[in-house]
């Protein structure tokens, strides 16, 4: 009998992997974000094989490559899951090129150590900040960071989920109202793309691309964005504090996930109607 390859999964990353921007995250961050959604897909897949599935999300908002690939990596190696995803670099995009050497070495070391333990690694590159003109200044640095990540991953023949090349993120509807985190549409799409990259059978239902309405964005929305998001961001930079200070990972150790009828979404097999409910973590 064929054995399911991914009976346990650990997600490493920053706020993008923690799930910020997903619907309802500010009230309850559990079962939110692309990684939690991918864990749900994996849980449904495992159920088809009659296997249990466990998941941990070690991502913490504001963390850099160095932080993710030191403390988070050590915890992942302690847990020893079947699968690890690494989405890092968003908080390093504006770093100088001189820092790229150390980032490259960290990523090489991380993938090497994970592979030595027999852990499958899926690497995610950085986004192309093309959705809002003010971010155009970051486009070149984002491309350079993505090239760095892809280059190291290819050295180890590790699969890469290419977010940078996706046209979807040129649309405001795939971003939360802070313009730096994914919306629920973005998180769902990434989870499905990761499932495709891992050659899984299940997918989450997505609204057709052309049917997703663009949010209204004018002077009022711009002022609101500046007051609620930009000013606090620069305030933290001036005080040299991180949004992740005093924040713990939401799933510090492996927790059992299983397909459940009271799940918050449903799975859908490619080419079929939804039939298997999404996974939820057991407490």
Q: What is the predicted function of each stretch?
A:
Residues 15-18, 61-65, 90-94, 127-131, ...:
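Solvent-exposed loop/turn segments at secondary-structure junctions
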Residues 26-33, 98-103, 136-144, 178-186:
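Alpha-helix N-cap and loop-to-helix initiation/capping positions
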Residues 90-101, 128-144, 232, 273-276:
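Serine-dependent acyl-ester chemistry module
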Residues 34, 72, 103-110, 145-149, ...:
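A general structural detector for well-ordered alpha-helical segments in enzyme core domains, enriched
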Residues 10, 39-45, 49-79, 84, ...:
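Internal alpha/beta domain cores that form substrate/cofactor-binding pockets in large enzymes
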Residues 1-59, 73-80, 270-275, 279-282:
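Serine-esterase "nucleophile elbow" of acetyl-processing enzymes
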Residues 155, 178-181, 185-283:
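Conserved catalytic region of serine esterases and O-acyltransferases that act on ester linkages
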Residues 131-164, 184:
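Substrate-gating cap/lid alpha-helix
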């Amino acid at each position: 009998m064929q054995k399911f390859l991914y009976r346990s999964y650990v997600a490493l990353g920053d706020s993008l992997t923690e799930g910020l921007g997903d619907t309802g995250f500010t009230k309850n961050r559990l079962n939110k974000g692309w990684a939690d959604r991918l864990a749900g897909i994996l849980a449904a897949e495992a159920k088809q094989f009659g296997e249990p599935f466990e998941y941990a999300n070690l991502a913490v908002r504001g963390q850099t490559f160095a932080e993710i690939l030191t403390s988070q990596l050590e915890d992942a190696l302690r847990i020893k899951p079947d699968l690890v995803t690494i989405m890092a670099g968003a908080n390093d995009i504006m770093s100088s090129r001189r820092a790229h050497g150390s980032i490259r070495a960290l990523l090489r070391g991380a993938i090497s150590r994970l592979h030595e333990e027999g852990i499958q690694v899926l690497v995610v590159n950085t986004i192309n900040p093309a959705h809002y003109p003010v971010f155009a200044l970051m486009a070149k640095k984002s491309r350079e960071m993505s090239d760095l990540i892809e280059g190291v991953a290819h050295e180890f023949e590790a699969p890469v989920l290419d977010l940078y090349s996706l046209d979807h993120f040129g649309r405001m509807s795939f971003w939360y109202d802070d313009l730096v985190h994914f919306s629920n549409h973005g998180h769902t799409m990434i989870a499905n793309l990761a499932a495709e990259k891992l050659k899984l059978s299940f997918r989450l239902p997505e609204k057709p691309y052309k049917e997703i309405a663009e949010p209204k964005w004018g002077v009022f929305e711009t002022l609101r964005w500046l007051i609620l998001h930009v000013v606090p961001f620069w305030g933290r930079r001036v005080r040299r504090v991180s949004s992740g200070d005093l924040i713990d990972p939401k799933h510090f150790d492996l927790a059992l996930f299983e397909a459940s009828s009271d799940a918050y979404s449903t799975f859908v097999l490619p080419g079929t109607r939804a039939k298997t409910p999404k996974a939820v973590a057991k407490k």
